[in-house]
Amino acid sequence: LGAAAALPFLPTAMPARATAPLRNELPPAWHRFKIGEFEATVASDGALPLGPPQPVFTNSSAAEMDALLRGAFLPTDATILDQNGLVVNTGRHLVLFDTGMGTSMGPQATKEAGGPWCSRLLDNLRAAGITPEQIDLVAVTHAHCDHCWGLVDERGNKVFPNAQVAVSEADLKFWTDDGNKRGPAFMTPFVDGAKKNLGAYRDRLVMVRDGAEVVPGITAVAAPGHTVGHHVYAITSGNQTVVNTGDLAHHYVLLVRKPMWEFSFDTDPKQSARTRTRMLDSFAANRTAILSYHFPWPGLGHVAKEGEGFAWIPTPTNVTTLG
């Protein structure tokens, strides 16, 4: 026996096993924070794939775009946006900003418009303790599919049965007019979807006006270009303000570093670029916090002036207090 007897018993070779099974699932995507005395909750509607960036950002050079994307450790052959729905509890009102893609237009149209990872807002809101019946105002930044198609279900029933819907008169008229089913292929489903969703609330529509409050503490600000009636919303409580910027800028690198680049889904790309540059400049100068619908989850942060454009500075996520 000798030295061999002193060795510990070694079992025969066995396949390696993990100490726990792989979960292969994600937790609900919601985040809560404070804006003064208001309580804000961001809930994800999922990811929105746009495909290769070159046809989407129309007046940019491929070389410059590739350099920016590589510098941000992003793929150069695909563009994927987040969709960050915001709910603000003012103590008197529970306001949802934009509805996500929803299911109103059926599985095929929803997948064609938003890809396979969208329409998750309601599940994430419920996980955060918020039900559709509690919402008393849906403030729509504009009437595109990923912002208003969640107002009704596939049968046309109201998803938010106790809510009014705030939208600009310009967007309401434009996106419910069959005469605008021309130009890019997306125009026909966008118009059909807006008609179905906004039409269901025709007796509960509130027309937003530039500079006017939709409820105390929440002010609509015109930001035209992406659509004719696109608005952002300034949310103020105490000495704190966060601006929900809707689709002012879709990409946190390309349209922030290069705000004058154009986006193919803009109704008026040049006006959109001017509006974006002007507002980002104001946010940077005034150190205004913003919540962007399409920036990386949860979309909360600031912009800082950098060269001919700006840089996106995300707010660190606080997981211990509401702030």
Task: Describe every region a protein language model picked out.
Residues 1-19:
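N-terminal export signals
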Residues 29-128, 232-248:
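Conserved beta-strand hairpin/beta-sheet module of binuclear metal-dependent hydrolase folds
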Residues 77-78, 82-85, 112-166:
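Active-site metal-binding motif and surrounding structural segment of the metallo-beta-lactamase
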Residues 138-148, 224-230, 291-297:
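Histidine-centered catalytic micro-motifs
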